[in-house]
């Protein structure tokens, strides 16, 4: 019932399965039990705990919002839709979850489970993720809001979608609102929701180099914009100029190439591994690169494919 924890869980659950989120949520809220502790920490600390969860803009927005809440809202989440939606990363549905579950006020939640219930109730065969569909669902959900027991209503609707009104083979005869379901009446419950045709993922080739001593590995801070902004990556192949490579010893057995899937891209990743006896012989820009203890590197803010590599070296 803590609005802070509702907020963190709702952000983590965007595009991510519950079973994946649970350990991250527990670790995150243990390290940052309240808004004040989150606002006072560094973005690096936030990203390190988020590492592997993906969609890193969520973590950056959480940190930005915590700082705003400390400065302008006395370290508390506001309890109005208008104020909540001014905060980075908090949209209509997340604000609705905070209001109904955290403050027990009227609030519309439109997560995937709730959308599916509402689409079937209304017999709506529009593609689920279209803007026009979202808009009509928002209005329909507002009409259905009860006058009291807002938390119980929202939680019940989410649970209904998760356990009974499932994506495939919904258990309609167990549903408490089956008599109000337009899709069941027309026997089209298995045809809803309709999803837009997904575009084929674009492929992107990434060639990394891993340079290590016996105890340290070289990482690069990604200053570029995009999903990995401010995270630590491995240097790319272009780092290896002639004057650098002469100080390195290639490792004969290199890491096998592998594929990492993002929501919109397929990353084809190859890796060459080098060792160096004396790291001081390698000229680096210390604003971008840093030698890190191998044992510490997996706990830094690194994206999932980098973490997988570091766990295996």
Regions inferred by a protein language model and the residue ranges of each:
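Intrinsically disordered, low-complexity, charged terminal extensions of DNA damage-control enzymes
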Residues: 159-313
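Catalytic cores of DNA base-excision repair glycosylases
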Residues: 1-171, 177-190, 248
């Amino acid at each position: 019932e803590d609005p802070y924890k509702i907020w963190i869980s709702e952000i983590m659950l965007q595009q991510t399965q519950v079973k994946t989120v649970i350990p991250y949520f527990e670790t995150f809220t243990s390290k940052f039990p309240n808004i004040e502790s989150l606002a006072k920490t560094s973005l690096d600390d936030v990203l390190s705990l988020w590492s592997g969860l993906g969609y890193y803009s969520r973590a950056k927005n959480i940190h930005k919002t915590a700082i705003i809440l400390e400065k302008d809202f006395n370290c508390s989440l506001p309890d109005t839709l208008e104020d909540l939606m001014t905060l980075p990363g908090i949209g209509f549905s997340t604000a609705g979850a905070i209001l109904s579950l955290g403050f027990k006020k009227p609030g519309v939640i439109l997560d995937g489970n709730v959308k599916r219930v509402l689409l079937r109730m209304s017999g709506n065969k529009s593609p689920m993720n279209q803007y026009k569909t979202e808009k009509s669902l928002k209005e329909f959900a507002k009409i259905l809001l009860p006058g009291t027991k807002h938390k119980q209503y929202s939680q019940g609707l989410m649970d209904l979608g998760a356990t009974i009104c499932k994506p495939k083979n919904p258990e309609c005869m167990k549903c408490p609102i089956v008599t109000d379901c337009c899709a069941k009446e027309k026997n089209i419950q298995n045809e809803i929701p309709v999803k837009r045709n997904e575009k084929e993922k674009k492929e992107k080739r990434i060639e990394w180099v891993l340079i290590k001593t016996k105890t340290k590995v070289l990482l690069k801070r990604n200053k570029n914009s995009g999903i990995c902004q401010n995270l630590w990556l491995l240097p790319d192949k272009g780092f290896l100029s002639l004057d650098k490579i002469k100080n390195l010893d290639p490792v004969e057995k290199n890491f096998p190439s592998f594929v990492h899937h993002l929501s919109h891209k397929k990353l084809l990743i190859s890796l060459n591994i080098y060792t160096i006896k004396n790291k001081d012989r390698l000229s680096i820009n210390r604003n971008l690169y840093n030698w890190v203890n191998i044992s510490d590197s997996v706990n830094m803010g690194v994206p999932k494919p980098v973490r997988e590599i570091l766990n295996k070296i």
